[in-house]
Amino acid sequence: MRMKGLYVVPLLLALVESAQKSDLGGDASAALINHSPMLIHRLQDLLQNSNSSDTTLRIRTANSNEVKVIHTHQLLLTLQSDIFEGLLLNQSEVTLQEPAECAAVFEKFIRYFYCGEISVNLNQAIPLHRLASKYHVTALQRGITEYMKTHFASESSQGHVVSWYHYALRMGDITLQESCLKFLAWNLSTVMSSNEWVTVSDNLMVSLLQRSDLVLQSELELFNAVEEWVSKKNPDVPVIEKVLRAIRYPMITPSQLFQIQKKSVVLASYHNSVQDLMFQAFQFHSASPLHFAKYFEVNCSMFVPRNYLSPSWGSQWIINNPARDDRSLTFQTQLGPSNHDTSKKITWNALFSPRWIPVSLRPVYSESVSSSSQSNRLEEGKPRLVMTSAMSGMDFAGVTFQKTVLVGVKRQQGKVFIKHVYNVHQSTDEVFDFLLNADLQKRTSEYLIDNSLHLHIIIKPIYHSLIKAK
């Protein structure tokens, strides 16, 4: 990818452009003659012409005798980097020690100072970001961060988001850390089946397992993936115990719990570490949640479902040509994860409107208002999604329902990646600000895959503590 834009234009050209605009004033006959592309081309030629340079950079790498020599110009380096300004004070030749991966892209990094443009691929993102951070080239640092945040879903043989997270952690880049964590959490099933999974660090694994917004098929899938990670990474015993205790066993069916008790090698070795949680899970499945809540604390993460994609928790909804008209969907979910409620289902109705306008803002029809202006007002409406229970008369004592909507925005190798997650407050049926900035009219919209809107609705029961039985 080639990064180019105003935020990476060299300071020299920005100052020239500002002066030119000032010269025009308000004269209607004035015109701007723009030869900045020619200037950029000539600046790039300077980098190739060592005869005109006034500065020499020598790039060395550890455990190597190779030295890369780059002839540059002090003015262009110091305009954008206070680090170079300090290094080149009263000297024209500097030797720099860089890791091999940074040395490999150093000439590309220097070329950026001459043209304000740089091409980036997945493998080069970290070394270029490291150089931009080290030499305080702020605009380039921001640009590469944005590149990374928009390329999480890009195809990569070994995966790259986990390594980007670990890099952001070392650099103290909180924004990039959170963006990486969010992508990993929302696309965990894909990550768990990739080569990246075994590269997850102990701390990252613990951080992920503490989250309730993980998107995956089931809690059993998560347990199996964690067991694989433990077997291949062989972390310290406290880490193994911590990740095993982060599994939400009540979200696994009794038959599946019996199965992992019998077949799991890791669980057999660390059964004592989770014995209390397994016993509590079987108790949870043996009684009604209402009765269970009288004796046990259910207002904790162990009893909060994650974003499970299996049919009993919700429904996929692919809306073709979503800008065309209103659509509706009816689906069923289980009342809750407790085995006691296996046979109990709830029916839900979902309504999607591509251009909804609140009644209070709708124009009152009259003969004085043209039909075209009424039509234009409708075009100004925003997408709306409402989800309601078709069984509102039922008594759901001790439980409310968290509605979550996943929006898939990109497909790689036939897989839809989740980029947007909307959580609906338990007291309402509407998803506020749903696709607020989406243009569903454009076939190239990032929200559409083959002109279809890919949604997945998840209904999660949230249990509430009741008065304890004496």
From Swiss-Prot:
Q: Where does it primarily localize?
A: secreted
Domain of life the protein comes from: Eukaryota
Domain annotation BTB: ranges? 53-122
BACK domain mapped to chain residues: 161-261
Q: Provide the alphabetized UniProt keywords.
A: Secreted, Signal
What cellular-component terms does GO give this entry?
Answer: extracellular region
Keyword Cell membrane present in the record's keywords: the answer is: no
Compartment annotation: Secreted
Which InterPro entries does the entry link to?
BACK (IPR011705), BTB-POZ/Galectin-3-binding (IPR051481), BTB/POZ_dom (IPR000210), SKP1/BTB/POZ_sf (IPR011333), TRAF_BTBD17 (IPR056184)
Signal sequence annotation: 1-18
Q: What is this protein called?
A: BTB/POZ domain-containing protein 17
**What taxonomic ancestry is recorded?**
Eukaryota, Metazoa, Chordata, Craniata, Vertebrata
In the UniProt record, the gene name given for this protein reads btbd17
